[in-house]
Amino acid sequence: MAVVSALAELIGTCIITSTPRLARSAPAIVVSVYLRLAPEHRLPAAIDDGFSALMWLRALARGDHDSYEPWLSNYGDFNRVFLIGDSSGANLVHHVAARAGQVDLSPVRLAGGIPVHPGFVRSERSKSEMEQPESPFLTLDMVDRFLKLALPKGCSKDHPFTCPMGPAAPPLDSLNLPPFLLCVAETDLIRDTEMEYYDAMKKADKDVELLINPGVGHSFYLNKIAVDMDPNTAAQTTDLLEGIVEFIKKH
């Protein structure tokens, strides 16, 4: 059974609508990672925590950890570990995977990364930021305020944490990354910079697939009322989960 490490602070609606369905369908053991939060703990604290969780899985796989997790030790396939995160957690997928590519994970194999609606942005507003409608899950004010609280003090949105395809970041072709599935919502405010990341990954000859959900916005699947009441939101949530499951099964 694949092991999926969820790099996000999962709120109730996400747990209800997404995580159990993913675990059942993959099938997979989903490990929810506890992350220190900003502004008390600015980045790279959450990246450090995500990487520490991966090292904990490696220790379990090697049998050299003091604690014992029956589900993981007895049923987890450490040869198929995936990183998944949504929104800001999707940024962590990229950075934790990049850091993991610099160390020996054996017997763990990082089989893939799944950034869902990543918070990749630039200081200059993109066309989609200026033209797409805001949603309850993401407004321009939220983008600005959240990143001001999360980034290292004095840093702009061009920082590698939020712009891994920018000139300040390590060249993507220099990174040892597993296969990626980038999930994008068509009406997401930050769709254009997410697509810029996809294009940069392809240009760097990285193994990256793209899944676009039409007619929905940032983190649409977290709205349980919409998932239950709106046919398109429900259908797109199913399509998103099925795409993620297909990617996991393929790798």
Task: Show where each model-derived region lies.
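Alpha/beta-hydrolase superfamily serine-hydrolase fold, recognizing
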Residues: 1-251
